[in-house]
């Protein structure tokens, strides 16, 4: 093809680019090693480590792209789809639990004998090939495989459920997204009953959450995925000074006083952390979620669990802090405004009550690949990640105003503090 013919000049230029990329990887690796060591010391920041790791990963990807060249890089996009499909098949078969987590190798026939489902040997061999070509499994002999640290997580119940949930729910929606827009117009989806997800899954008028609930196994995977997700970025809860803000109010409290309402708080990991951050202040953190979620919550001292649908009237009024973590990115603006208005109606202007939203706050440029990927996944069912300006505009529609944005250097996770406008 014109412009892509290998000439001495082109080869020399490519070699120079590769050497430059190698240098950048070395620099990023050294920085990561240094920051990771400092993070282990008292006062160290995991946010700094996350930022440095993201920079290292970015530079490694750039190096890989330089070495591969455009054709190989494009081919690898298709290879990634094939590998995901193979991994999903192996996860369903139970293969990752059939290969020793210790790293001890297992031959194909051994793996087959440990599976609880009937699997054709030739099929298993072909699926294992692609997962061992460059990971996550490793091929240690003819038709013999062993686990790696990467593949080992696929045997963890919550993590494999998360993987299944993402592949089963988002996979078809991402793949058919172009066709959805071709048929429905090139505009941002805002109707949860007419979006890439509903198009791909043929939900017949149901939005995603209602559709998933029709399938017990998929609902189970979804619940476990939400549980696993509750740990992701949980450190960012500490960005907001809960105790300081509550003490500023000068309000007398006792053991039964609601200090914070954690709305849509899931399994309660965040609620427990907030209560710890408010150590020394009498009162409780109210954990709210749907009844089926609350039913599985383990008791935690200082945390009161309550069944609640955040689209309905907020029953706990006049609390110092209302807290939303990774909720609004699941919803388009119209639905998000409804959620916010329910909270605003319960807030005390004189106190004043505060709303704290822990979410990604996207930069206006230079977004990370991870944040962009999450935003694409959210788009499949009308959700979205938002910039500072978009958060301000969203809050204004609900009669609220942002008064402060809390951020950690090098990470998109932050906290938006808002009061009644």
Which positions does each model-derived feature cover?
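Short amphipathic alpha-helical interaction segments
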Residues: 117-133
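Conserved adenosyl
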Residues: 2-5, 22-33, 39, 104-106, ...
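Short acidic, hydrophobic short linear motifs in intrinsically disordered regions
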Residues: 102-115
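Eukaryotic partner-binding/assembly regions in large regulatory complexes
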Residues: 2-60, 64-69
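Short, glycine-/aromatic-enriched active-site segment of Class I SAM-dependent methyltransferases
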Residues: 366-382
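A short, conserved structural fragment
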Residues: 132-144
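Short alpha-helical segments that sit at the start of domains
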Residues: 64-93
